[in-house]
Amino acid sequence: MKPVLLFLSLISASAIGANLSDDTEKTVADCSAAYQQFSFDIYQRFEKHSSEADEPTNVVISPLSAWFAVGMLQQGANSTTLNCINKALYLPDDFRGLADYNSQLIDDLLKPCEWNENEWGEGEKPVLELANSFWADDFITCHDKYIDTLGICYRAGFCQLDLALPESMAAIDAWVKDKTHGTIPSLNIQPSEELLMLLVNALYFKASWQDGASIEDTKEMPFYTSSDDVKNVPMMYFDYHLDYAEVEGFKAVRLWFGHDRRFSMTFFAPTDDTAFDNAIYTQAKQAFSSEYRVILRLPRFTTDAEFLLNETLQEMGMDEVFVSADLSGMADGSLFVSTIKQLSHLAVDEKGVVASAASVIAIETGIHPEEIKYLTIDHPFYFTIEDNSCDKVMFIGHINTIDEESVKDPNSLNKIGNTSSDAIYDMMGHRQSSLGKGLNIVQQGGKSRLVLVK
């Protein structure tokens, strides 16, 4: 089997629950285990769909971003809809503790890195940012309790605007672009009279290798894709004592970011047709040894992906939300989920990594069409990115091809993620600036509202 790289960004969650009472420790443990199962299940289902596609492509997803987006939806669900969402998340029926768990998880994820600026420098400090938001059409009345819970537990800003206007979608896209530092410029959601609400999560990660590669050592070498094509791509050269392991079907190597060893990225090179799953990941994590000198050749690459999650989440148990959902915790009326999708970006070079994701859930009113069929994508080269203080998978993916044009510039990473649009809202939804010509945000009744300025 040709080399296949899998991308699986992982944040380690050993710190989750450190400040919680004994009564909640079991909930924390149950949610952490559920998250790990959810992460690999959603990835493996994508992998299956991708392998069936006519033209296999790279798969890069963030289970962490999807977890938060679906978690916000779960908060507004009741009865059997709540249970079907919990099933997809590997949580018990009627479970209501997810918001509290995610609140603590967000605190742990956003805690400052232990960083000695005098010794290591401010510029090399890893950056992990996440943001949530809730957007509702201006004619619908959302329940205050739901808005307040999202604000407190998910740090989600709330804004009402006319979702049938292109200007409204532009405002939401600007929020996403800002939170992902320009790496995801648009959610590609069309304005619609039927669209009532959008739940959005944005995730951004940027870090430098603890021991980087020299551009002078990078050479053009062949990369063999899953479709048996051969592409000449820039191969970076690492020669260090690295964490290395050999497990069933894979050779694995782990590279650390920064000097505090909180974040890491693991690459899995297949040696046969063994499927990459949670068991393989866990075996490698337990088997790593740094006693070996490892000479690693790794391609420099950039890849972007957009995936519809509807079919995958239906297979995982969330079929009811796409037909006739009970979302009465969010608002009154006949509601259903029309779209759940994720966009992602990944760039890897001699200095380090930039990874970002945005997940969006679109909620509409009316009767859902009886049948919709969806198609996703595919296949070669495995990896993981970890925050080893929280134990959570942030990104899962599968690199099958390298865009030769996108990786010719050895300084491409420095040009990514440093531009951002003007901030629109802070984490609690307060207005930061106007939205540009013809648009502004006003406060009415304690809530933000988008208005056209003539």
Each PLM stretch: what is its role?
Residues 4-13:
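Sec-dependent N-terminal signal peptides
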Residues 1-4, 454:
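Positively charged n-region of N-terminal signal peptides that target proteins for export
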Residues 16-85, 95, 178, 367-370, ...:
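Flexible propeptides and autoinhibitory/regulatory segments associated with cysteine proteases
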Residues 56, 92-271, 287-369:
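Non-catalytic, conformational "gating/processing" segments within enzyme and secreted inhibitor domains
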Residues 202, 436-440:
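A glycine-anchored, Pro-Gly-centered beta-turn/N-cap motif
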Residues 199, 251-268, 369-403:
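Extended hydrophobic
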